[in-house]
């Protein structure tokens, strides 16, 4: 009789007689578990999406309030530098950390009486609410009808003159060559002579014959000059339409020979 080797597995009568079965999970319980996991993933995704959107809106509001704001160009007063429907970005660091300079393109709030009452466009309550919200946080260009864009010609104390049609502007006695003027535009059509008051600026459009600028408000308080406190910032780039994208550089050579006011 041969004895079984020690290393040969022996069958277990008890195990063979009573095999152990895997626990059976009901189908409805498994499905419920899957649905629970899916709901948890959906809630997590929704929460992360809301956090991202809120963070983006807060960041946009901070940027608009302290750094950059978008504006829409509605008129031809700055041709050919800016044309209708251009979207520009304006740096709110000037004035502020950075000074304004003669030749800068500036956006400023209407000092009073420069603009007609805005015409409301029919958008419906939802469209109006969406537009106002996006404008408030800086994701939509401001076209509220209370801002203007012009070129800064004179700073506080500057003596700005023009002898009439066909004559050049002078600032503190220095004549200006203005390459940014619209084709065919003259530096001025009528004579004027002004000294810019303290904390103010003298502004003119590049399309002089189609710009109701400082020249046309000389009979008002400030003599046509705009308070510097009204300045929103300096335009520095056209961002839309894409084929008109360009940086808006200061024409430094135009004002290079202008002396400080005496």
Regions found by a protein language model. Name each.
Residues 50-66:
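Hydrophobic membrane-insertion alpha-helices, especially the h-region
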């Amino acid at each position: 009789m041969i004895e079984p080797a020690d290393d040969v597995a022996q069958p277990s009568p008890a195990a063979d007689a009573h095999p152990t079965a895997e626990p059976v999970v009901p189908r409805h319980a498994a499905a419920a578990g899957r649905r629970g996991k899916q709901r948890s993933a959906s809630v997590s995704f929704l929460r992360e999406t809301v956090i991202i959107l809120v963070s983006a809106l807060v960041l946009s509001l901070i940027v608009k309030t302290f750094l950059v704001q978008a504006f829409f160009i509605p008129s031809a007063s700055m041709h050919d530098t800016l044309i209708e429907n251009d979207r520009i970005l304006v740096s709110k660091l000037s004035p502020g950390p950075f000074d304004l300079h003669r030749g800068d393109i500036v956006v400023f709030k209407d000092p009073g009486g420069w603009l007609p009452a805005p015409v409301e466009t029919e958008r419906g309550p939802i469209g109006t609410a969406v537009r106002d919200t996006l404008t408030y946080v800086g994701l939509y260009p401001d076209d509220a009808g209370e801002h203007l864009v012009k070129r800064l010609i004179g700073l506080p104390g500057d003596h700005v003159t023009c002898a009439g049609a066909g004559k050049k502007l002078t600032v503190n006695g220095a004549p200006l060559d203005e390459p940014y003027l619209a084709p065919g535009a003259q530096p001025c059509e009528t004579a004027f002579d002004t000294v810019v008051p303290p904390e103010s600026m003298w502004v003119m459009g590049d399309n002089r014959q189609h710009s109701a600028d400082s020249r046309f408000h000389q009979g008002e308080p400030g003599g046509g000059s705009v308070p510097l406190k009204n300045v929103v910032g300096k335009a520095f780039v056209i961002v839309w339409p894409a084929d008109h994208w360009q940086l808006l550089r200061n024409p430094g050579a135009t004002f290079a020979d202008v002396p400080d006011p005496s």
